[in-house]
Amino acid sequence: MSLLDKIFAGRKPPQDDLQQRSRDAPAAVDADGTEIYEEDIVSHIMQELERRRNERAVLELQWTLNANFLAGHQNCDINIASRRIDDEQYVTKADNERRVYNRIAPLMETRHANLKSVNYDMVVEPRSAEMDDYAKAKVSTKLLAYCQGDTDFQAKTDKLISWAELTGTAFTLSFWDPNKGDLIANEGAVCDEQGEIVQPEKPIRTGGLDFGLVSSYEVFPASLCVQEIRDQHDIIIEQVRDVGEIYDLYGIKLQGHMMETYVLTPMENAMTGHGRNNIAIGMSKEQVEDVEKVVTYLENPSRDYPKGRLVIVIRDAIVYYGDLPAGEMPIVAVKSKPVAGQFFGKSPIQDLIPLQRTYNRIVNKIQDYVDTIAANPLIAPEGSIANLDELDATGIEPGTILIYRNVGDRPSFLQYPDLPSTVLSERDHIASDMEYVAGVSQLMVVGATPSGVTSGTAIDNLRQIDNTRMSLTADNIRDAVIAMARIWLRLNKEYSSGYRTMQIAGSDDAGYVYTWCADDINSYDIRYTAENELRHSKDQQRQDFVQALQLGAFTDDNGQLSKSAKQRARELFMGDSAVGDAFTLDELQRKNAARENAFLDQGVVPERYRYDDDAIHLEEHKKYALSMDYRLLRKAMPQYAAAFDAHIDAHEQALAQKQNAMMQQMLAAQGGAAQNG
């Protein structure tokens, strides 16, 4: 019995679906009504793919070199003639060091850590001043928050930053996944004439939005000199995917092949001195098994194709031909450093590589100097050492007895001059230049200030300069996320049918269920709820808060600090996680009142609780009553608004009764004091 028979227990192994297809019928009709055959479409796409691959080859080599230097495989360079990365094999003495002292990795890790701190909470602006548009903008804002949580946005953004920093550009591809969402029904299994199941039972779901990451290695634009995706005629994406993943995505069973793809793999780092070959991790092409190429052709909308074109080709066969999702290019580019007039961005590693080579050479020369001194070289008259061959092979080890002839001066250690300070200064200068090129400083990398900088103001200025330079990349990422969010809204509007529900967590630690439909999406004007943190960092916010506090901006007429200012101070100086532990009773009352406001939007009318602080609840409820959300609620659900007004009246009556009771107690106390007097 074969291995396949054991796996499938006597059942037929999966057939290759593409081999059973007929390709005689036309695949599509162009704008003039001419029939287009599958063979012609596939041939055109594949020819374009190879042309673009040749044009992009040098850039691909640069990305691979970037990956090698980041991983520590640095004794290599680009061979333009052979179009590959070759190890540097120049001849040196056996004892000369050629080690790698990787400074690129910690610098890039510092950049990554700072870029991860950026916030991506978004809000959709209403299309007009109409009440309905405000309500729809609120639904769209909640929908974006839901999509971020449902698509594992944070983890994917982390990988997105890594790829953008490595190659200069990373891409996101948003799509509608019919296998996500709530279960509607199950499609029955399909059997052949013999009763064997040819298509198992399949669940039918409402569908949901998702997005994936695409590396620069997989993207082939129509022109390398057209900077924006919207200005490209089309883009081709070539991916090597596992056949199981292809079946999950497209429902097509394939027998996989062995293909080449880029992977990080252990590789020799050339001769490093003393006859040793070190192993380092580097980027290279390796063979992977049971995979197949998936080629995706995306054409921007044009006069002939107003909704664009999307063609998916697997093994020279079209598995999908149609319009772009929602008639818009679903791919977004995230660039670390945009280059004017170029489609692909630039990685900081590319500018760091020449400095890293120089740094390695300088430190290796210093190490050669140290090794030479540590070898204890001798100077002796000719013929004075009897066991010269043995001594030359082993050197002077601890405890060695040196036998020499008294034929002149006795052997002595060779005196070397001190290492010139210029060498050490140059090493430090190169290290400083690398920090400058990477957009960071010693303050950001190791927390140490440059020599001679002791002033607090100067240190704050250095920190602000670092954040400002890093914020350029952060702004590029934030702009790309905004563009992706617009695509999300359009995909939801295009593919959502009927009324749908989404569960999200609110800012007051409560979960909410929102009901919406595609008609609720009518605005694509999106902005962030907060400024780029790298432009206005947490430290800068603390400093601004202290300055405003000193000016009396947070004190009332009696000179007392307001409760909201105290809460803001806890958030800035103690962190968000410590705020909940530091809540006073008044702050808990305020949080409870805000939760009642939010529940009202879900149809839950609040009731006055015996432990409610009426004054605090009145303040929070009246704030909500003056907001646009309450105006929308009053229009949509007037009965709930009336109940909420009655709830406010109940608090006012209870507060008035308490105040009257306190007044009576004060008058009674004053009257008793007068009688005693």
For each feature predicted by the language model, list its residue ranges:
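Generic, well-ordered alpha-helical scaffold segments in large soluble proteins
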Residues: 143-150, 352-376, 426-441, 473-498, ...
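Extended amphipathic alpha-helical segments with heptad-repeat/coiled-coil character used for oligomerization
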Residues: 178, 455-593
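Long, highly charged low-complexity segments enriched in Glu/Asp and Lys/Arg with interspersed Ser/Thr
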Residues: 562-594, 628-670
